Amino acid sequence: MKKKNWIYALIVTLIIIIAIVSMIFFVQTKYGDQSEKGSQSVSNKNNKIHIAIVNEDQPTTYNGKKVELGQAFIKRLANEKNYKFETVTRNVAESGLKNGGYQVMIVIPENFSKLAMQLDAKTPSKISLQYKTAVGQKEEVAKNTEKVVSNVLNDFNKNLVEIYLTSIIDNLHNAQKNVGAIMTREHGVNSKFSNYLLNPINDFPELFTDTLVNSISANKDITKWFQTYNKSLLSANSDTFRVNTDYNVSTLIEKQNSLFDEHNTAMDKMLQDYKSQKDSVELDNYINALKQMDSQIDQQSSMQDTGKEEYKQTVKENLDKLREIIQSQESPFSKGMIEDYRKQLTESLQDELANNKDLQDALNSIKMNNAQFAENLEKQLHDDIVKEPDTDTTFIYNMSKQDFIAAGLNEDEANKYEAIVKEAKRYKNEYNLKKPLAEHINLTDYDNQVAQDTSSLINDGVKVQRTETIKSNDINQLTVATDPHFNFEGDIKINGKKYDIKDQSVQLDTSNKEYKVEVNGVAKLKKDAEKDFLKDKTMHLQLLFGQANRQDEPNDKKATSVVDVTLNHNLDGRLSKDALSQQLSALSRFDAHYKMYTDTKGREDKPFDNKRLIDMMVDQVINDMESFKDDKVAVLHQIDSMEENSDKLIDDILNNKKNTTKNKEDISKLIDQLENVKKTFAEEPQEPKIDKGKNDEFNTMSSNLDKEISRISEKSTQLLSDTQESKSIADSVSGQLNQVDNNVNKLHATGRALGVRANDLNRQMAKNDKDNELFAKEFKKVLQNSKDGDRQNQALKAFMSNPVQKKNLENVLANNGNTDVISPTLFVLLMYLLSMITAYIFYSYERAKGQMNFIKDDYSSKNHLWNNVITSGVIGTTGLVEGLIVGLIAMNKFHVLAGYRAKFILMVILTMMVFVLINTYLLRQVKSIGMFLMIAALGLYFVAMNNLKAAGQGVTNKISPLSYIDNMFFNYLNAEHPIGLVLVILTVLVIIGFVLNMFIKHFKKERLI
């Protein structure tokens, strides 16, 4: 076992020695000649100085123009041939300073352009152009780089002064242009005032004069009309229209007299007719005939049994005779005659069809019509699918079933129209195969145009109507909350009092216990709220009736009544109504055209088949000739069928006793009724007595009324004449009033037009005033702080003469000229190797002696945990001591300034403790694998150092843990970044490493983990 342990120790020692030798060789080759490079750069003149430019400037706006002075500074340096400039990021520049790729880093700060354009500031802030030189340079090289920075800064200050002067001149030119624009606008306003208002107002009095003349004329006609009407009324005698009510009108008398005579005559005639009919009716003959018929029925009933056989014999003889006649008939057409007729008829029809010019013209016309119909049908299908620019509304969207359902159709309708869309796509593909690429057609892409058509809501709006009756004893306030997506027009009536539909609170009359609420208005969708409205497609209007705060009843615990009258209109249907109807109409039209297209498709233009037609006609004629024999056989079969059914038919006729009995009973009843009628006719009717003297009273009444009616007629004629004269005067008055109305309408239209013009002119003048005010405001800012009272502003003058100052980003290192400074890379590498050796010592001791137990486990079950804590403390303390020693040595070697030494030593101690704790845990827990991980981290660091070029940092530098430690010390030594967060992270890592070493799991069997 001991021999095996020594073999492991020897292998690890060899690996560490090889790593140290490789590191020393690498560092020597990479950093050994750094001082030589510094001295050599002095002798190679200024063009050997590499300057990294870091542009962090953000653009700004001045006088409406975009200003980027950082880019201008870089372009200025691009023309400089004495030095080598490169524009890089800050990380690349710092890496270049670190490895000698750059001698100077110039940083253009973020607010460079903003601070440089402080021409209007009273006390402008200084602009600093930051720079940093590489660590470890010779004093002569450092002085040369300072000179380079100063020269670059002086040149750029000169350019800035030129920019300031140019800006001032541009402001003056802009002021000159704006003054000219102001004069042009004023001239335009004066011209509009003369044309729009002054001239129309001068013509305005003429309209009033015409209206006055027409009004005076109408007034005269009205006065004349009333005078004539009054005169007619005064001249009329009221007694004339009084009629003696004791008499009826003559027309009633005449009608009554005539009606009396007519009824009297009709009565006489009816009596005469009755008497004549009585004498002419021969009831005895009818009765005797019916009795004779009754006796015949009795005789027929008795003879049924004896005559049945005779009927059967007679029917059979007739059928046999008919059968013999039909059988004797023969066909007039022989077989040879039929064939000859077939041949002759065929030749005749062929000649007729071949030489018939009208038939050929008809066939050609049909062919041309079919071709023209197919062409028109294809054009119609093309127009149904394709959307023409601007005007076309009959086109087809590429809609799916879900699109139709979203537009408001049910599933059956959606399936129907989806099938039509598929037909349109099928026809589109067929059409494109036949046409060149330039004539291809496509369905219009669908983007919810049908389901989201808000034009009707924007233009027409939606009606808002509601009627409600609210009863409450404590309601005294109405709160109206409108939908922010809509503009509301209309009013809310509460017990007849109107309020506008808008967001407001209204105090109600508390004397009322019942409120009748009527809402009537229109809500129009706002154009800018269309997108938000389409999320729920609902319009809301809330009317909340409640009670305002009652300060006089603070202890009243009675619940307050609240009535919520909310109107929610789901407008989903309004979004698709017009557009959906249009789309469905287009689809139905295409479907009809496509069905006609599929019916006509595939019909080839074949020649007319004359032979088939001739054969069909000849066969029809020949079949009729040959069917004689078949018809004869059919007739014989019918005769046989009649003979078979003859017995049944005779039996049905002769055995109908029930019907015979019923007829006999009906005849007996009819004979009895006629006997009763005969007795009635034998009696003489009594004639009615009529008093014809009553007619004289009606004649007397008519003669008395004639005089009264005549007198009324004369007065009516006079009144009619007066009325006609009044009508003519009224027509004249109506014409004059119409003319007055026209003049008033003209006045109204002219006044309205003048109002519109005045508003336009007012808006134009307001816009001009706004533009002038803006110009004055902006021009006032130009160099407003150029003077401090009556004196020149010295601060602004000093800023404009030398705006940009240089600022050296000081390093933590005390650079003492010709003294070389150790690199942080070598420093980090030495700390890591020292931690690896320390970790291996702890690991070897534990393998040889076992786990360190400062407290025996026998006394308490918790002593094992305390031993782990003490072990972790020993490891951490070792790292702390090593970090303190290394930090003191590095502090002197780096020549760290006095104010930064404590933080530097703290960083080194924490870093060393992290290295020792983590590496010790890896070796104690995973042994060989831990050693592999430690060496892998070291290898990544070597690769990262080799890739640390001026062009940028590679991927290995980002994944290498030691590279982050290296950057941490480099940034601190160059005073670039604060270290507060760094110290917190290191402290957390120390705690994690301490805890990990407390919980080491020892395996019973030795193995390679």
Curated annotation (Swiss-Prot):
Q: Where would you say this protein principally sits, based on its record? A: membrane
Q: What GO CC terms are in its UniProt record? A: plasma membrane
Signal sequence: where?
none
- Phenotype of the disrupted gene, per the record: Deletion abrogates the secretion of EsxA and EsxC into the extracellular medium.
The record describes its membrane topology as: Multi-pass membrane protein
- Which keywords does UniProt give here? Cell membrane, Coiled coil, Membrane, Transmembrane, Transmembrane helix, Virulence
Q: Which Gene3D superfamilies match?
A: abc type-2 transporter like domain
Compositionally biased, Basic and acidic residues: which spans? 680-697
Which parts pass through the membrane? Answer: 7-27, 822-842, 869-889, 903-923, 928-948, 979-999
Q: Where is this chain's protein located in or outside the cell?
A: Cell membrane
Could you tell me which InterPro entries the record lists for this protein?
A: T7SS_ABC-Transporter, T7SS_EsaA
Region Disordered: what ranges? 680-707
Family to which the UniProt record says this protein belongs: Belongs to the EsaA family.
NCBIfam families recorded: T7_esaA_Nterm
Q: How does it assemble?
A: Homodimer. Interacts with EssB.
Stated role: Component of the type VII secretion system (Ess). Provides together with EssB and other components such as EssC and EssE a secretion plateform accross the cytoplasmic membrane in the host.
Q: What is this protein called?
A: Type VII secretion system accessory factor EsaA
Q: In the record, what lineage is assigned to the organism producing the protein?
A: Bacteria, Bacillati, Bacillota, Bacilli, Bacillales
- What gene name does this entry carry? esaA
